[in-house]
From Swiss-Prot:
This is StAR-related lipid transfer protein 3. It catalyses: cholesterol(in) = cholesterol(out). It comes from the Eukaryota. Pfam families: START (PF01852). It comes from Salvelinus fontinalis. The gene is stard3. It is a multi-pass membrane protein.
């Protein structure tokens, strides 16, 4: 277990992934992300559930797959500048790490659950530390959760009290955007509100929807004295379709965050798990509200 990728693969599989000669003690964070990204491209079979061939997500006003630059009608948005290409690369790196986390579910450590059956797990990630993973079963189609949580992040503050605001700073291409997010205070006010700037990559696959992201810098939102600027490691939202029942789905939230400030680690961990459960309560209420108005 001194290697980056050792989740049940034999020697040849690890060699194929390009990870055999990368012990954790000798690689940098950038090398780790590059290796994970390369593994996801060269060996998709190690992600049996998270990765499948399918159509990519595209925003309502654009068409995925176009090679043209953004025109007056908003079709075919793609990264052009070096900064935009760097953002796309960051998004792909975050997506690769999230897919690795999903592929290692047998290594998730159970932490706690609530009275409706939602469970929080943790997993130690190289260079990013403890990652929290919430897994919940939902009595609604995957498309509904995708619409509310992944497709419309800027509207989440309307129903999710754990978030004070979300603003789309830039749509980089049909799969990548940069968002500015404000997280509400937690732990009874002991943890004050934090703000984040994240790059997000969204993909729509045959059996799931995925939004993966991580912290980035953007000229549109430099750090402000009003908030402590937090920093997210690779994480995101996953909505898994049911192969047998289209009216239910599984929701997974992967959270790796550094809230900064001088907070005791135990308090941070307690507040993160509580926030994840609270988010699920708000999400279920949102789904009920939507169904009652249809």
């Amino acid at each position: 277990d001194g290697y980056i990728c050792n989740n049940g693969m034999d020697k040849e599989e690890r060699k194929m992934c390009g990870l055999l000669l990368l012990p954790l003690r000798s690689v940098s964070p950038s090398a780790y992300l590059a290796a994970v990204n390369a593994a996801s491209e060269r060996a998709p079979m190690i992600y049996p559930r998270a990765v499948s061939e399918g159509q990519f997500y595209s925003p309502p006003e654009s068409l995925a797959g176009s090679e043209e630059d953004l025109d007056e009608e908003g079709l075919g948005r793609r990264a052009v500048s070096p900064q935009e290409k760097a953002l796309v690369r960051q998004g792909k790196e975050a997506m690769a790490v999230v897919e690795q986390i999903l592929a290692q579910e047998e290594n998730w450590k159970f932490e706690k659950n609530n009275d409706v059956g939602d469970s929080v797990y943790t997993l130690e990630i190289p260079f990013h530390g403890k990652t929290f993973i919430l897994k919940a079963f939902m009595q609604c189609p995957a498309e509904l959760v995708y619409q509310e949580v992944i497709l419309q992040p800027e509207k989440m503050a309307q129903w999710n009290k754990t978030v004070s605001g979300c603003q789309i700073l830039q749509r980089v291409d049909d799969n990548t955007l940069v968002s500015y997010d404000i997280a509400s205070g937690a732990a009874g006010g002991v943890v004050s509100a934090r703000d984040f700037v994240n790059v997000r990559r969204v993909e729509r696959k045959r059996d799931c929807y995925v939004s993966a992201g991580m912290a980035t810098d953007h000229d549109g939102k430099p750090p402000h004295s009003r908030y402590v600027r937090g920093e997210n490691g690779p994480g995101g939202f996953v909505v898994l379709k049911s192969s047998s029942n289209p009216s239910v789905c599984t929701f997974i939230w992967v959270l790796n965050t550094d809230l900064k400030g001088r907070l005791p680690r135990y308090l941070i961990h307690q507040s993160l798990a509580a926030t994840m459960f609270e988010f699920m309560a708000h999400l279920r209420q949102r789904i009920r509200d939507l169904r009652s108005t249809r």
